[in-house]
Each structure stands twice: as structure tokens, then as C-alpha cells.
Amino acid sequence: MKLHELKNVKGAVHRKKRVGCGEGGGHGKTSGRGGKGQTARSGSSIRPGFEGGQMPLYRKLPHRGFNQYNFRTELPVVNVGDLASLDASITEVTAEVLAAQGLIRAGETSVKILGDGELSRALKVTAVKFSESAKAKIEKAGGQAITA
């Protein structure tokens, strides 16, 4: 299954809400915006964390420390079981081969191999990272796990 093959589940798509078209439609007069005030006006959006002008919580509390979360690199992952489902003619597996087979996005140059599933044939797999179980399964099947 690929992204362009997805279909909506029955009942997931609703008719659009026609607001301001008379009281009989159920969304007339205030168009579902409640009474008067800032949030009833057009263009109104209050930024997250705004508390009406009082000193917000995120400014009351001290900020300490630093982490690398924003600078992490997320690698696309492929399981050993997915490698087993590749064409029989493929003996060397790289990121380009996986992209051509639709297992990772086109243009991805690095990949991590994880150990879910079984592998029955010898493959020469080149990847940036391997889990320990994936490396063991590839080598047990007679293949090579090469870290790029």
C-alpha cells in the first residue's frame, strides 16, 4: 500500500459547515463563534501560551539546560523481513536499491536496518547503521552487513 492508494473510510468525510446562512441551518447569526469579544472577530488568533496579558507560565519558570533533540538525524528504517521480500535478482542492497523498490523515499541516501523478520538468502547490505539482531541475521544467512 502506498500513499496515493489510500482511500477515506466510509463516514470519515463530512459535508462542509455552511455558517452565517440563516438560523435554520443551525450555524446562523454568530456562525458558531459564541458571543462578542476578541475571538468572535475576523483575523483573531491568540498565540499559544498567551494568558490575557498576565505573566505567562513559561516566563515565570526558570529555563535550564540544553538538549540535542532539535539537532537529531532521523534515519529511515527497513527491517530484515523487508529485505527478504526484495526481487530474487537483487544481491547487493543499498539505499538507492531500497528507494527504487519503494521501501524508503526516493532521494534518501542513508538507512538503518532493523532485525524484525527473517532472511533466508545471502545479501550484501550496505547501510549507515545496523541493529545487532539485524547484523546477526544477515550474517547467519551468509550475507554481509557493511557499514557505510
Curated annotation (Swiss-Prot):
Q: Which GO terms describe its biological process?
A: translation
Key words, A-Z: Ribonucleoprotein, Ribosomal protein, RNA-binding, rRNA-binding
- Molecular-function annotations in GO: rRNA binding; structural constituent of ribosome
What are the boundaries of the region Disordered? 14-54
Query: Origin, by domain of life?
Result: Bacteria
This entry carries the following GO cellular component terms, namely: cytosolic large ribosomal subunit
Q: Which InterPro entries match?
A: Ribosomal_uL15, Ribosomal_uL15/eL18, Ribosomal_uL15/eL18_sf, Ribosomal_uL15_bac-type, Ribosomal_uL15_CS
Q: Return the Gly residues bias intervals.
A: 21-37
Position of the signal peptide: none
- Assembly information from the UniProt record: Part of the 50S ribosomal subunit.
**Family stated for the protein in its record:** Belongs to the universal ribosomal protein uL15 family.
This molecule's function is given as:
Binds to the 23S rRNA.
Q: What is this protein called?
A: Large ribosomal subunit protein uL15
